UniProtKB/Swiss-Prot annotation:
Pfam families: Glyco_tran_28_C, Glyco_transf_28. It comes from Bartonella bacilliformis (strain ATCC 35685 / KC583 / Herrer 020/F12,63). It is an enzyme of class 2 (transferase). Keywords: Cell cycle, Cell division, Cell inner membrane, Cell membrane, Cell shape, Cell wall biogenesis/degradation, Glycosyltransferase, Membrane, Peptidoglycan synthesis, Transferase. It is found in: Cell inner membrane. This is UDP-N-acetylglucosamine--N-acetylmuramyl-(pentapeptide) pyrophosphoryl-undecaprenol N-acetylglucosamine transferase. GO terms for molecular function: UDP-N-acetyl-D-glucosamine:N-acetylmuramoyl-L-alanyl-D-glutamyl-meso-2,6-diaminopimelyl-D-alanyl-D-alanine-diphosphoundecaprenol 4-beta-N-acetylglucosaminlytransferase activity; undecaprenyldiphospho-muramoylpentapeptide beta-N-acetylglucosaminyltransferase activity. The gene is murG.
Amino acid sequence: MTNKKVVVLVAGGTGGHLFPAEALAVELRQRGYDVHLATDERAKRFVRHFDEKHIHIISSATLVRHHPFALIKTFWLLLRGMVQSWILFRKLRPVLVGGFGGYPTVPPVWVAALTGRVTFIHEQNAVMGRANRVLATRVNAIASGLLLENKIHIHKTFVTGNPVREAILKAAEIPYCASTSKQPFYFLVFGGSQGASAFSRIVPEAVKLLDHDIRERLHIVQQVRGEEIDLAKIYQDMGVQAEVAPFFDNMVEHIARSHFIMSRAGASTVCEIAIIGRPALLIPYPHALDHDQAANAALLAARGGAQIMLEKDLNAQILSSLLTKFCCEPHSLEQRALAAKKVGKPQATRVLADMAEALIVGRSLLDMKREFFDENTT
């Protein structure tokens, strides 16, 4: 039986929710804590830093309105998850419970708060997600990745940033170097399953409109869906160097090497681009819940580190004009790269762990603001 203090982190079973939880877990273990993960079945595909005995599956479900039978099932699963959470906490006796978004966080964090345990939530996006909104009034602190100031919760909201991979921090040491008129211009295009199809249609049309001398310089790295892999042949026929694939193991290297990026605006993407310091054209996913990607993009654009364009407004002519401009005026991209880097928060994992330890020892919220988060004080 370990004598270490136990911390339970709770996250929905997708990479976006799990990664910051895992990053914090690694840091807290180095500080001597025994860290457990409460999540749902989906997490098994993504978890890297928890062994089986430290993973606890909790029942939950996404709230579905206007469907009575689905609503009944959802409430039953939430109730079951609350009972499971209560039993788990009785066994582990955690000194801290932290939620990282997604509906699976609701039962454990709710029960933890209800039973008087110290709690926090971490919001990755500039707009608070639905599960975190349910929990915001009940927790002791709200850690902000990109979250815009919310006057209702300002007294307990702390800007920590979003934890990123160690590879991102290493890539951040590589300075941005503008592409001169005789050098290749690296253009990175990615958007996951939510962006690949739209980008695969627009980018080659834009490339066709470029002058020959610019096409000769262009080196495209583009994420596509599996059925769109023949895009490589289209670029080849236009005389453009291109790497096309559904997934890149070395995506961090591609971000660091790029002169210009076109991507969606998920929280992790925006944070990684900012920390490495690369200029971007951000196209928010139009069907994102609560328009969180638009808010994420707006935060970086407001500091001059990115340009936003709605998908409905993007066409081949506009993209072609942008590529021509940036190939001919590389120093404007240098300025955007510097602006993006100023937004990045490479110390996010450490700051989040500092906040967690402050909560554990009972530090007041005001003291925590003064010491760690002066930039969030109004």
